[in-house]
Amino acid sequence: MDKKLNNLILVLNCGSSSIKFAILNPDNKEKYLSGSVECLFLLETYITWQCLGTKHKKKIGANVNHKDALNFIIEQVFSQQKDIFKNLIGVGHRVVHGGTKIKKSTLIDSNIIKCIQDASSFAPLHNPANLIGIKMIIEKYPSLSRKNIAVFDTSFYCNMPETSFLYAIPYNFYKKYGIRRYGAHGISHNYVAHRASLMLNKQFKSLNIITCHLGNGSSISAICNGICVDTSMGLTPLEGLVMGTRSGDLDPSIIFFMNNHLNLSIDKIETILNKKSGLLGLSGISSDFRYFEKKYYCKKHAKRSVDIFCHRLSKYIAAYTSVLENRLDAVIFTGGIGENVPLIRELVFSRLSLLGFKINSNLNLSTIGGKSGLITEDNSTPVFVITTDEELAIAQETNSIINRK
């Protein structure tokens, strides 16, 4: 047995329409198994995975749900890796929303499962999927039942000030029902913020940065002296930036108009705002940013959609400079779009030249495909592209908690 196959963590991320998994060593950061199931509930659900350098891809079927996909992963992938699995010391589960009670990563027990269930109203597309993964792993691997750790996206925001997390509605709605800003993507924001502190050679506790996680779901966070003081996602992951299928910010009266004048039910409106808006709604064609990158200069609907995306993002960046105590060390771009679409970085920072941003075109164009680095001129406020690794962050947090027990 390879000695490196010790101290392994299984990381499971059950999303709304996908499942990602990985087995890695949190100390040497080496991944031994990784993969994903994409396009759940659609006509063609497929799985791709890589184990010890060998790549695989299979079609699972049509209209596959989370349980079906997890059973396939367990029976067709995990069962073939007995040497790896017998060296697992724990399982880390990404959970989007911890609700009002959970402030940090924690060992999963019946009480934590109930808290995640109770918080599902705040993350209706994500928490139920997270719970399916948790329950199946505990059921299928009873020897690890006391070594399942929940790592929450909302934990990163637990120290935000009231000025950021309260909405201007009757205060009792917060005290009685927990209606407030919670944020999301906290695992990613926290990871790239710590990477940025190393790249800037600054103590994390003195770091003032703005982090932009841009993907199918997008969010932005302001970090002042190492503490997140504001973020764009709110009670749910619907608020904030323009996203793939989510609207982001809008006038709440739009909901009343849709309901009262268009006779749309609340459930129908919720579906529209979560699954049929954003880039998909603006273009009427796609939510995939690769499409918009190709068509930006030749299709009006693509240019319109991208320009609105960039307009919203640049406004947030400018606004967040106001909560950083008069010092901005850097802006960080991460996530699938943030890491791989130079066009977006160019368009956003061309709108922010007043704040001292000067993009280096060559660095911007070459920093893609997993590369991290500075993309600005020497006399500019720094902008970094940093590749996120939520799986590694979850594995390291899981390992830390297990070793504290």
Curated annotation (Swiss-Prot):
ATP binds at K20, H213, L214, G215, N216, G217, D288, F289, R290, G336, I337, G338, E339, N340. Pathway: Metabolic intermediate biosynthesis; acetyl-CoA biosynthesis; acetyl-CoA from acetate: step 1/2. Its cofactor is Mg(2+); Mn(2+). Mg(2+). Can also accept Mn(2+). SUPFAM superfamilies: Actin-like ATPase domain. It is an enzyme of class 2 (transferase). GO terms for biological process: acetate metabolic process; acetyl-CoA biosynthetic process. The active site is at D153. The keyword Nucleotide-binding applies. Substrate binds at R94. The record marks H185, R246 as: Transition state stabilizer. It is found in: Cytoplasm. Keywords: ATP-binding, Cytoplasm, Kinase, Magnesium, Metal-binding, Nucleotide-binding, Transferase. The keyword Metal-binding applies. Pfam families: Acetate_kinase (PF00871). One of its GO terms (cellular component) is cytosol. InterPro entries: Ac/propionate_kinase, Aliphatic_acid_kin_short-chain, Aliphatic_acid_kinase_CS, ATPase_NBD. GO terms for molecular function: acetate kinase activity; ATP binding; magnesium ion binding. Homodimer. NCBIfam families: ackA. Catalyzes the formation of acetyl phosphate from acetate and ATP. Can also catalyze the reverse reaction. Belongs to the acetokinase family. This is Acetate kinase. It comes from Buchnera aphidicola subsp. Acyrthosiphon pisum (strain APS) (Acyrthosiphon pisum symbiotic bacterium). The gene is ackA.
